[in-house]
């Protein structure tokens, strides 16, 4: 499995000693920053994330991988809840978020694997997507034989939320949990958005609220051969989204939802994406269009935009 990172680590706005530790989990580099006296909880958080990876990852030998191979696995509450949420997000986004996109992203492109390749149009059009074909009962989780799941479009956000829930139970209210582009600032923080065209940042933002959830999705890190064959695929057309090269969303205490929404917005046509985001006033956004134009909105409740710089 290849590892990816999309985001710059936020800077905490607090006094006192802090500690940041990093591990490679869930196909990315995970950075956890907490007050130094909470070092033990950083270790606990990493172990929790490894447990979530064991369930949600579509790579061998994890549970979703087993489901994709055998099309039935014993009931697992973590996976069942993630699938249930995914069905809700499918409905919320009018089908632009669809975890059965795995029939294309995993079964045909093999994104993140050494044997990745570009499928032909005939194979793409034959690939089956049907989120309603996933069945959950008291003893098992079942998919149809022509369906492959990929929870990568919401899994990291889901993992961030589960870790933050645990830290909240330990009365920890300062720190940052960062899984690539899916981040939670427990208290106030300043962070940068990375240009899709270079390693520099094009915007600096400061959170206005504690428990800010951040999710960034981009076409420029995970692809096969060249960036036109990136991993953000419209489940309606089986083709790559073309309107945006970067989508960053912000909200309060819900990384799972904005991870899924960022995935969906990335593959929507421009007009539909802007209509969707303007309707969801509970979500702030910064978008980089394929022509390099930057569009943003609904930010005032969540972040202060300190600066916007040239993308190139």
Where do the language-model regions lie?
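Mature catalytic core of soluble alpha/beta enzymes
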Residues: 3-4, 14-312
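N-terminal signal peptide c-region/cleavage motif recognized by signal peptidases
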Residues: 10-11
